[in-house]
Amino acid sequence: MFNSDKVKIGICPIGWTNDDMPDLGKENTFEQAISEMALAGFKGTEIGNKYPKDVKVLKKALEMRNLQIASAWFSSFLTTKPYEETEKEFIAYRDFLHAMGSKVIVVSEQGHSIQGQMETPIFDGKYHFNEEEWNLLANGLNKLGQLAADKGMKIVYHHHMGTGVQTTEEIDKLMSVTDENLVYLLFDTGHLVYSGENPVEILKKYVHRIKHVHLKDIRPEIVSKVKNEKLSFLKGVRAGAFTVPGDGSIDFEPIFKILAENNYEGWLMIEAEQDPSIANPLEYAIKGRQYIKEKASI
């Protein structure tokens, strides 16, 4: 199905320790997390807050476990702060990831985002960009995309619950106002289904701009609870809205099929934030890896 020389399977550290809610997984160390990732059969990871900031130290720890850094999250504030502030932070981030051998940089606009607000209802409190803000976002992302290209890298935009780019319409808008040769898309199954979007249709439409994939499943009964009880994104995570592929309601087979048929190259990353005291990270990592092996033959 997939070309195993071109597609790698990784997992994000958020199942072990949650950067947005540090009490979740506070007992789990960096070394434990990456050791269990390797044990579960993964080849890569993204960067979490507990990871060493020194390139040599991080590389040594990963190389001992045959792991690579696939990417890392970068928060842009192009709609709410001067561009120069975002650019300065981005360049430092880009250079660190480049030194680690990463090819893509995950970017998500956090201007007006409610994803990190503990009390704001995720389905009712979302902000919508005006035209001026869309222009700021598009121009800024194009510039960041060029800065990434200068190092042989790509930026992949992460559509996300509670942000200005969440829905199908907003993803369409983002793709239409940005340069297709500078700004690419991160495809996240869980965030699309959570939002009520059709992931297969979005994948078909933008498969050639998708350069990074987050595989995340949802528990629909928890998402319904979040909606009915007007819970925040973070409270939804605590309640168990997300889980690993194969443990929720999303059918990943057509997604794998479309990616493979279009010769997708890059990382398939499990990213499934939940409470590690309830969902044992190693157990769920193994469960997710086995599901991918069964359904994607990789």
Curated annotation (Swiss-Prot):
Pfam families: AP_endonuc_2 (PF01261). One of its GO terms (molecular function) is myo-inosose-2 dehydratase activity. NCBIfam families: myo_inos_iolE. Its cofactor is glutathione; Co(2+); Mn(2+). Keywords: Cobalt, Lyase, Manganese. This is Inosose dehydratase. Its EC number is 4.2.1.44. The keyword Glycoprotein does not apply. Pathway: Polyol metabolism; myo-inositol degradation into acetyl-CoA; acetyl-CoA from myo-inositol: step 2/7.
